[in-house]
UniProtKB/Swiss-Prot annotation:
Gene3D superfamilies: 2.40.50.100, 2.40.50.150, 3.90.1100.10, DNA-directed RNA polymerase, beta subunit, external 1 domain (2.30.150.10), DNA-directed RNA polymerase, subunit 2, domain 6 (2.40.270.10), RNA polymerase alpha subunit dimerisation domain (3.90.1800.10), RNA polymerase Rpb2, domain 2 (3.90.1110.10). InterPro entries: DNA-dir_RNA_pol_bsu_ext_1_sf, DNA-dir_RNA_pol_bsu_external_1, DNA-dir_RNA_pol_su2, DNA-dir_RNAP_su2_dom, DNA-dir_RNAP_su2_hyb_sf, RNA_pol_bsu_bac, RNA_pol_bsu_CS, RNA_pol_bsu_protrusion. Signal peptide: none annotated. This is DNA-directed RNA polymerase subunit beta. It comes from Acidiphilium cryptum (strain JF-5).
Length: 1400
């Protein structure tokens, strides 16, 4: 239970610079959880890195070690125990790992204890001989970065959480599909977390069978016979109390009587005498049995002989209860006994002979035998129309009759072909479900089982119990009898999330189990007295399991780093695919569909289009994953029709008991629900109830959708399919050089920017001390304003993301600014003033324009391209390696054979391109030469070689050249050298620059610390009496400001004072300062040492150079653009500004969109956004004019304030704006003069009336339409046009990446046809259908060219080239190489094919 905090609306440093007006009516009272906590919390719980070893919980890595250790050797002489583990400091930090292509990981040291026993050969008693304890290195454990990612081999990866079916017991039926009669065949399945599956099922004859691990089925009673009987359980308990154990021979299974007693009650039939003196049979009267039955004959009270109900009467429940008050037993005819089943073995009281076994049917003959033997009571099974004979019939059909038979039968099914013995059968059966090492239900499975079966059992009991199996079969029989409900496997109560920590735990367990076998074998093969723990351990299997998981698991994915939203969404993704999950092909509609329990947990909108639809989902905004892996969503509690000030996170199972109202249910200020009937959700249905029946209410309207869907304004006005496209396309928006935050937002922009890690967030409150383009230095201050330390934030400048977009951070603060903890101090890619900014606000008109916006094409103004509104920077990385080859070392050099000076103009003396050089396709980036093979030399060459020495002819040019289609500016070069290899001048220059940067950081931090230390020292010294010890200050002198001013600041620390307490405080201060300076120096030296040490390289590589090139991409025809409502299109034409349609005041529009794209797509949200954006922009312009007037004339201040009050409303104005200083007000107005930013939260946004009010305030037509003139003629269009500001994005599908043309290029080796694809610089495929087209036109020569000289006629290609060189135009086509391939293949089949080209 959580109380609602009042601090949700704290105004941050950036919020004051640009205030976003919200149209939301429902106050946000519940804090939204951090968006990437799913990842971080899971991995922290797995590693427990910052928890001391003795207080770690038994989960995650700790549990893996505890479950595998201790390991005993086969002889019982040695045991290896796990004591604790610790993670040391990682060798490189995150940035270094990305640069060097390393994995960000920490060495894992495990302390193991080896115990050696002395074993007495006669008695077998053991005594400890030796105990050895030692830390053992167990490989590196990858660490998670602060942003929830892993750096593996230099690239950032994300482990996607997996949805899978929860362990536990599930009941289902075949929906009548199996049997021709259409009757339901019920089944139950016990799914463990680890171990054998257990399936129970009815067959068409209504017998119950069991399958173990989907093997051949057995009658369920075979399994029941194999379970221990009551007598054995009692015996086991008695033995365990004495500390003894049971022998295998003493174990007895359940017998038929015990099985039947568990599943059926007993109905005793007794012999009685009637009033007439005749003998008859009577049975107890139970209202439940007779309820709803139609009587065949009169119902007679056995004691009084009175008729209590007439024949042909139908007994209602009420009548049956009334009869039961007076009547205990009723008479029955002999015919009622015939066909019933005996409940227990019946003996002849005289001879002891068995008349009937338990479960046997009573026939006429049997009944006569019972009567003749004088049996006065026959116990029968309580089988009637309400309870079917399913177990009894199965028992009758089962050929086994004892535990031994049953165990052997089970053994034969599990291990067919192996000869069973009673010992192996017993061991196998025990290992299947009752051995904690092989079977694990997990805590979740046990909790789910308890809930479904109505049992109470600790969640530490992870194996199956006899009670679980019996209760499962009992519930299945009840389902068959028509009582209870089957389970819905798509309910989120039955599906759970496996996050990073759990996936990693399973993987590490696999690695440790591989190790365990090796350790056991090694313990047996060495002299155990003389070894230490590390001699027994080979950590490679564990390290390999981890490496394999991060490198190649389906759930370890290359992070989508296009923009901050795509990062956040990727980390919040839930996949039903992956190991142990579903496959695309097998997943049906039900599992992909939206389920009522998804509400507030999984987004119903955001999922991929295509084969993965519904299998990959996104967490909803407020959702969390609980300790059992179930997704929870928060609800505010409601009591007696009043909303309380507390909220609670609930899973789908817990929500079943609640009646939940919508967040927008009308209520008073104190939370009282006002409507007579409230619309609520209960058990997945919608209904209307009275307010006092409501038990909970949604915390926010946006808790239903994911982060990406919550960023779409007017989502409620868009069709779901288009909203899905809108959510997915926002993730593809490339960061622009200058992004705008949307004028029409939803209020989610700031949380996404903050939690994504794209921006820099202040860790502690403080004052900005220094700032430049690459770093921010904050002098941290405590709560009381005293200096606490220094925080240096390094900005990421022009770094390449996984998708080659540009990561660049810009400071938002100035020197002297005060910032609080959690404030955003630097913007990153696609953020502006701490808010997500994926695109630009552009002036759009919905109208046709000469057919250029046919089929969703987009027409843009030249101004958009010229002012770089949609220009993005992409950073391409190129690398070259100098290897040690058999012929000698490759060399990176400027001295390249047969290359002119012009081609080397961008290279320095080391042969590496300069930073800042403008490069074009074909330019050399890094010069490299490779030794050539020794070819036989002529005598002349030998002579020349002897005279002139080694020549350049020994090497060939293998330089790194810029590939076609790329041109840009070199922004960074990194040189890596193998350890022990001499560094070239360029590598040394880069190293020097890096050391200077580190030294500057160290010096600045030291200076701030020293300043703080001296200030605190000064406070301590002032007013004190000086002691002896400092030359120039007499003992007994009072220390004043003037005295301190005369002494150099550095010498203050040498002063002493007579007050011992103060002197002790000064000594402590000095010690703390010296320690922090020492730590600083150590950190600096370790970083420098790493820089100078040289790099770890792949085998055979001596040197590696990486060149990063920034490519500037302007918006051009062929680029894909989109809005946030699924309205996507391709730029068709860039029109000169003067030709664009313009408004009455002469403003040309930026973008023209097709109005036909709206009605059929049903995404009307884009129109509402356009109207509201138009109002925002015009209000901003008015505020801008008012600010200019105020700057000219101070008297205009009141008008400006009145305008701001009118726009933002009284509450925000009084809270935030009224108290602003002049400079703050000017900054605010400067930031909103392009448009007043507004938030229209999803499902709680601006109404039509709000939009009309805004348009009216801005002095615009409330229709939102304007008169527009044609830019070419200047004439007005005949009707008004919808014009306004829409937020447009440029998507990652750019024409530059796709367009491609080939002149000459590589050919396939066998077919000699050109390769395909842009990456191979391939040709265009001229396929079968294209051939048909040329055939249809009769273009014979063109067709011949296409199939021969332009494709795979090798000699013909050469002749064409020669003809072109000679400036001739005659050539002849030969035989295509593919024809030769065909003849060769026919020959390989033994068919000799000869091509006879002679002309008769």
């Amino acid at each position: 239970m959580n109380a609602i905090s009042g601090g949700l609306n704290k105004v941050s440093f950036t919020n004051r610079k640009r205030i976003r007006k919200s149209f939301g009516r429902i106050p946000e009272t519940t804090p939204m959880p951090n968006l990437i906590d799913v990842q971080r919390a899971s991995y922290d719980a797995f590693l427990q890195m910052h928890v001391s070893p003795d207080s770690r919980t038994n989960s995650g890595l700790q549990e893996v070690f505890k479950s595998v250790f201790p390991i005993d050797d086969f002889a019982g002489r040695g045991r290896l125990e796990f004591v604790y583990y610790e993670l040391e400091e990682p060798k490189y930090d995150v940035e270094e790992c990305i640069q060097r292509g390393m994995t960000y990981a920490a060495p894992l040291k495990v302390v193991l204890r080896l115990i050696v026993w002395d074993v007495d050969e006669d008695t077998g008693a053991r005594s400890i001989r030796d105990i050895k304890e030692q830390p053992v290195y167990m490989g590196d454990m990858p660490l998670m970065t602060d942003n929830g990612t892993f750096v593996v081999n230099g690239t950032e990866r994300v482990i996607v959480s997996q949805m899978h079916r929860s362990p536990g017991v599930f009941f289902d039926h075949d929906k009548g599909k199996t049997h021709s009669s259409g009757k339901y065949l019920f089944a139950a399945r016990v799914i463990p977390y680890r171990g054998s599956w257990l399936d129970f099922e009815f067959d068409a004859k209504d017998l119950i069978y069991v399958r173990i691990d989907r093997k051949r089925k057995l009658p369920v009673t075979t399994l029941l016979y194999a379970l221990e009987g009551r007598a054995t359980e009692a015996l086991r308990a008695a033995r365990e109390a004495k500390g003894e154990s049971l022998e295998i021979g003493e174990i007895r299974g359940m017998d038929a009587e015990e099985i039947l007693t568990y599943f059926y009650g007993k109905v005793p039939f007794t012999r009685t005498r009637t009033r007439d003196g005749e003998t008859a049979w009577a049975r107890p009267f139970e209202p439940e049995t007779f309820r709803g039955a139609k009587l065949v004959e009169d119902l007679v009270d056995a004691e009084t002989g009175e008729v209590v109900a007439k024949a042909d009467d139908k007994l209602t429940a009420r009548v049956a209860r009334q009869i039961a008050v007076k009547t205990r037993t009723v008479l029955v005819s002999r015919a009622d006994l015939i066909g019933r089943y005996v409940a227990e073995d019946l003996f002849d009281p005289n001879t002891g002979e068995i008349f009937a076994d338990a479960g046997e049917e009573i026939s006429e003959a049997k009944l006569k035998t019972f009567e003749d033997a004088g049996l006065d009571e026959i116990p029968t099974l309580a089988i009637d129309q309400a309870k079917g004979p399913w177990i009894r019939n199965t028992l009758a059909a089962d050929k086994n009759a004892s535990r031994e038979d049953a165990l052997i039968d089970i053994y034969r099914v599990i291990r067919p072909g192996e000869p069973p013995t009673s010992e192996t059968a017993e061991a196998l059966f025990r290992g299947l479900f009752f051995d904690a090492e092989r079977y694990d239900l997990s805590a979740v499975g046990r909790v789910k089982m308890n809930m479904r079966l109505g049992l109470e059992c600790e969640d530490t009991v992870r194996v199956l119990r006899k009670e679980d199996i019996l209760r499962t079969i009992q519930i299945m029989c009840e389902l068959k009898d028509g009582r209870g409900q089957v389970d819905d496997i798509d309910n989120l109560g039955n599906r759970r999330v496996r996050s990073v920590g759990e996936l990693m735990e399973n993987q590490y367990r696999i690695g440790l189990l591989r190790m365990e076998r090796a350790i056991r074998e090694r313990m047996g093969s060495v002299d155990i007295d003389g070894v230490m723990p590390h001699d027994l351990i080979n950590a490679k299997p564990a390290a390999a399991a981890v490496r394999e998981f991060f490198g190649s698991s389906q759930l370890s994915q290359f992070m989508d780093q296009t923009n901050p939203l795509s990062e956040v969404t990727h980390k919040r993704r839930l996949s039903a695919l992956g190991p142990g999950g579903l496959t695309r092909e097998r997943a049906g509609f039900e599992v992909r569909d939206v389920h009522p329990t998804h509400y507030g947990r999984i987004c119903p909108i955001e999922t991929p289009e295509g084969p993965n639809i519904g299998l990959i989902n996104s967490l909803a905004t407020f959702a969390k994953v609980n300790k059992y892996g179930f997704i929870e969503t928060p609800y505010r509690l409601v009591k007696d029709g009043k909303v309380l000030d507390e909220y609670k996170y609930l899973s789908a199972m817990e929500e079943e008991r609640l009646t939940v109202a919508q967040a927008d249910a009308p209520k008073l200020a104190d939370g009282t629900l006002t409507e007579d009937l409230v619309s609520v959700r209960r058990n997945g249905d919608f209904r209307l109830v009275k307010p006092d029946e409501v038990t909970a209410i949604d915390v926010s309207p946006r808790q239903l959708v994911s982060v990406a869907a919550a960023l779409i304004p007017f989502l409620e006005n868009d069709d779901a399919n288009r909203a899905l496209m809108g959510s997915n396309m926002q993730r593809q928006a490339v960061p622009l050089i200058k992004s705008d935050a949307p004028l029409v937002g939803t209020g989610m922009e700031a949380p996404v920017a903050r939690d994504s890690g794209a921006t820099i967030v202040a860790r502690r409150a403080g004052v900005i001390d220094q700032i430049d383009g690459a770093r921010i230095v904050v002098r941290a201050t405590g709560e009381d304003g005293t200096t606490q330390g220094v925080d240096i934030y390094r900005l990421r400048k022009f770094m390449r993301s996984n998708q080659s977009t540009c990561i660049n951070q810009r400071p938002l603060v100035r020197v002297g600014d005060r910032v609080g903890a959690g404030d955003i101090i630097a913007d990153g890619p696609s953020t502006e003033l701490g808010e997500l900014a994926l695109g630009r606000n552009v002036l759009c008109a919905f109208m046709p324009w000469n057919g250029y916006n046919f089929e969703d094409s987009i027409l843009i103004s030249e101004r958009v391209a010229r002012e770089d509104m949609f220009t993005s920077i992409h950073i391409e990385e190129f690398e070259v390696m100098a290897r040690d080859t058999k012929l000698g070392q490759e060399e990176i050099t400027r001295d390249i054979p047969n290359v002119g000076e012009e081609a080397l103009r961008n290279l320095d003396e080391a042969g590496i391109v300069y930073i800042g050089a403008e490069v074009n396709p074909g330019d050399i980036l890094v010069g490299k030469v490779t030794p050539k093979g020794e070819s036989p030399m002529t005598p002349e060459e030998k002579l020349l070689r002897a005279i002139f020495g080694e020549k350049a002819s020994d090497v060939r040019d293998t330089s790194l050249k810029l590939p076609p289609g790329v041109n840009g500016t070199v922004v960074d070069v990194r040189v890596f050298n193998r350890r022990g290899v001499d560094k070239d001048e360029r590598a040394l220059a880069i190293e020097r620059a890096e050391i200077e940067r580190l030294a500057k950081d160290r010096d600045d931090e030291r200076a701030i610390q020293e300043r703080a230390f001296l200030n605190r020292l000064r406070e301590k010294l002032l007013g004190q009496v000086a002691g002896s010890g400092y030359k120039g200050v007499r003992s007994g002198t009072e220390i004043t400001t003037e005295l301190l001013a005369e002494i150099p600041r550095g010498a203050w620390r040498n002063l002493t004072v007579q007050d011992d307490r103060v002197m002790a405080e000064i000594e402590t201060l000095k010690r703390e300062f010296d320690a922090s300076v020492h730590k600083l120096q150590q950190r600096f030296e370790s970083k420098v040492e790493k820089l100078q040490r040289g790099d770890e390289m792949p085998p055979g590589v001596m040197k590696m150079v990486k060149v990063f090139i920034a490519v500037k991409r302007k918006l051009q025809p062929g680029d894909k653009m989109a809005g946030r409502h699924g309205n996507k299109g391709v730029v068709s034409k860039v029109v000169p500004i003067e030709d664009m349609p313009f408004l009455e005041d002469g403003t040309p529009v930026d973008v023209v969109l097709n109005p036909l794209g709206v009605p059929s797509r049903m995404n009307v949200g884009q129109i509402l956004e356009t109207h509201l954006g138009w109002a925002c922009a015009n209000l901003g312009r008015q505020i801008g004019e008012a600010v200019e007037a105020y700057q000219r004339d101070v008297a205009e201040r009141e008008r400006l304030h009145a305008m701001l009050k009118s726009v933002y409303g009284e509450e925000i104005y009084n809270e935030q704006i009224a108290s602003m200083s002049d400079a703050e007000l000017r900054e605010l107005c400067g930031n909103i003069r392009k448009g007043v930013p507004i938030a229209t939260p999803v499902f709680d946004g601006a109404r039509i009336t709000d939009i009309e009010d805004m348009l009216a305030k801005a002095g615009l037509d409330v229709s939102g339409q304007m008169t527009v003139c044609d830019g070419r003629t200047g004439e007005q269009f005949e009707r008004k046009v919808t014009v306004g500001y829409m937020y447009m994005l440029k998507l990652g599908h750019m024409v530059d990446d796709k367009i491609h043309a080939r002149s000459i290029g590589p050919y396939s080796l066998v077919t000699q046809q050109p390769l395909g694809g842009k990456a191979q610089f391939g040709g265009q495929r001229f396929g079968e259908m294209e051939v048909w087209a040329l055939e249809a036109y009769g273009a014979a020569y063109t067709l011949q060219e296409m199939l021969t000289v332009k494709s795979d006629d090798v000699s013909g290609r050469t002749k064409v080239y020669e003809a072109i060189v000679r400036e001739q135009d005659n050539f002849e086509a030969g035989v295509p190489e593919s024809f030769n391939v065909l003849t060769k293949e026919l020959k390989s089949l033994g068919l000799n094919v000869d091509l006879n080209l002679s002309v008769d």
